[in-house]
Regions:
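A helix-coil-helix interface module used to build multimeric assemblies
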Residues: 1-174
């Protein structure tokens, strides 16, 4: 079947595509994978700061920077690599875990702690935090700025049209 507006999975991918394009950065599958990586990295860093877990020593500043850069420089090709792993594992969150282990294997500190990536977590732990970050980021960067523009325009129109008489209406009827 050809890819067109009529064969889109939903109207959001079809006729409304141009209207929701700014949200793609926050709600695409790529975005979900990126947020999963962010959550897994944050969890691993938190474990390294936990003195009660002797098996994971506190990471050096260089290692923390490497982990942060993995998140900030996450690319489409990284996402595609995770999808290739997922094709083998049939598990989306496990694929992120395996990708992190492979990608960070050259770091001695992380290699020693590799089995603690995803430690004591369920997939839902990772997913619900990822979805929360998706919502938070989209609100901050797309939705609230758009609402601010709407409010500004309404205030402008209210001042501009304050002296214009209008017929009162109830349910669209005069």
């Amino acid at each position: 079947m050809n890819s067109s507006v009529i064969t889109a999975l939903s109207p959001l991918d079809g006729r409304y595509h141009s209207k929701v394009e700014p949200l793609r950065l926050y709600f695409s599958e790529f975005a979900l994978i990126r947020y999963r990586v962010q959550v897994e990295v944050a969890w691993l860093k938190a474990l390294s700061h936990e003195p009660g877990i002797a098996e994971i020593p506190l990471f050096s500043a260089e290692t923390e920077i490497r982990l942060d850069e993995l998140v900030t420089h996450f690319s489409v090709s990284d996402g595609e690599a995770i999808k290739r792993i997922e094709a083998i594992t049939n598990h989306d969150v496990k694929a992120v875990e395996y990708w992190l282990k492979q990608t960070l294997a050259d770091n001695v500190e992380i290699a020693k702690a590799a089995e603690f990536i995803h430690f004591a977590c369920t997939s839902e732990d990772i997913n619900n935090l990822s979805h929360g970050l998706m919502l938070k980021s989209s609100l901050e960067h797309v939705m609230l700025p758009a609402l601010d523009q709407i409010i500004s325009r309404l205030v402008e129109l209210a001042h501009q049209l304050a002296d214009v008489p209008m017929l009162a209406r109830t349910h669209g009827q005069p």
